C-alpha cells in the first residue's frame, strides 16, 4: 500500500510540475502579415503605426479581438489606440480603407481578411528597439513547469524593430525587422521577457 501511495505521489508530482500544452487539435491560428513600422504627422505630432492583414484560414468562424502592446528598450510601454484623425491621415497616405483597434474587433468568417492599422501615439522617440506583442491571433496556451517559473503563457506574435538614427533625426519610415515570429509570453506582470517557441 505504501509503495502504491509513493508511486501515486511521483505521478502526481510529474503531472503537477511538467509543462502542460494545449492539445494541437483544440487551438486555432489566424494568418497575420504586416508592413513594418511607419510614421505620420497629425496636428504636428508624429504618430507611429503599422498596417496589417489578418486572414481566417481555420475553416470556422473565430472571434478576433487583438491587443497590440509595444515595449521599448527605454522601458516604456504603450498600446494601440483609436484616433479618427490619425486613421484618416493613414488611409490617405496608403490609399487603402483600414480599420482601427476599435473597428477591427469581432467575428472573422472563414476565408475573410481584415485590413487594420495599429496606431501608437506615445511611442518613445528616443527608443532604438521597439518590441511589439500581438495577442488574439490564436487561442494556444501552455503552463510551464515550476522549475522554469514561467507560469501560464499564451502564444503571441512578436515583432522586433530596430530604428536607426536618434530622436528627431531618424529616417522616416526606416526600420529594420530583427524578429518576426510566434513566441510564448507569460501573462504575469513581472514576466515581460518572451520565451521563444521551440
Task: Kindly give the residue locations of the regions a language model identified.
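Low-complexity, acidic Ser/Thr/Pro/Gly-rich terminal tails and inter-domain linkers that flank the onset
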Residues: 23-45
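The feature marks short-to-medium sequence segments in extracytoplasmic or secretory-pathway proteins
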Residues: 55-109, 144-174, 180, 186-198
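Bacterial N-terminal signal peptides that target proteins for export
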Residues: 1-8
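Short, solvent-exposed loop/turn segments enriched in Ser/Thr/Gly
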Residues: 45-51, 114
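Bacterial N-terminal signal peptides
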Residues: 8-18
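Short Pro-Gly-centered flexible turn/kink motifs
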Residues: 107-118
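Short, surface-exposed ligand- or partner-binding patches at beta-edge/loop junctions that are enriched
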Residues: 115, 121-147
Amino acid at each position: 500500500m505504501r509503495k502504491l501511495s509513493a508511486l501515486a505521489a511521483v505521478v502526481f508530482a510529474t503531472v503537477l510540475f511538467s509543462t502542460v500544452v494545449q492539445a494541437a487539435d483544440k487551438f486555432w491560428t489566424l494568418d497575420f502579415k504586416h508592413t513594418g513600422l511607419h510614421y505620420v504627422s497629425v496636428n504636428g505630432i508624429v504618430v507611429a503605426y503599422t498596417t496589417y492583414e489578418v486572414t481566417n484560414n481555420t475553416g470556422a468562424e473565430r472571434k478576433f479581438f487583438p491587443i497590440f502592446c509595444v515595449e521599448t528598450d527605454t522601458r516604456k510601454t504603450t498600446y494601440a489606440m483609436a484616433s479618427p484623425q490619425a486613421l484618416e491621415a493613414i488611409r490617405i497616405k496608403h490609399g487603402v480603407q483600414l480599420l482601427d483597434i476599435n473597428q477591427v474587433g469581432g467575428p472573422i468568417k472563414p476565408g475573410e481578411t481584415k485590413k487594420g492599422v495599429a496606431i501608437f501615439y506615445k511611442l518613445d522617440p528616443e527608443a532604438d528597439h521597439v518590441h511589439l506583442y500581438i495577442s488574439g491571433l490564436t487561442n494556444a496556451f501552455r503552463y510551464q513547469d515550476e522549475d522554469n517559473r514561467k507560469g501560464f503563457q499564451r502564444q503571441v506574435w512578436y515583432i522586433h524593430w530596430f530604428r536607426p538614427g536618434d530622436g528627431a533625426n531618424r529616417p522616416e519610415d526606416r526600420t529594420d525587422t530583427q524578429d518576426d515570429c510566434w513566441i510564448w509570453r507569460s501573462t504575469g506582470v513581472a514576466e515581460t521577457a518572451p520565451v521563444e517557441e521551440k
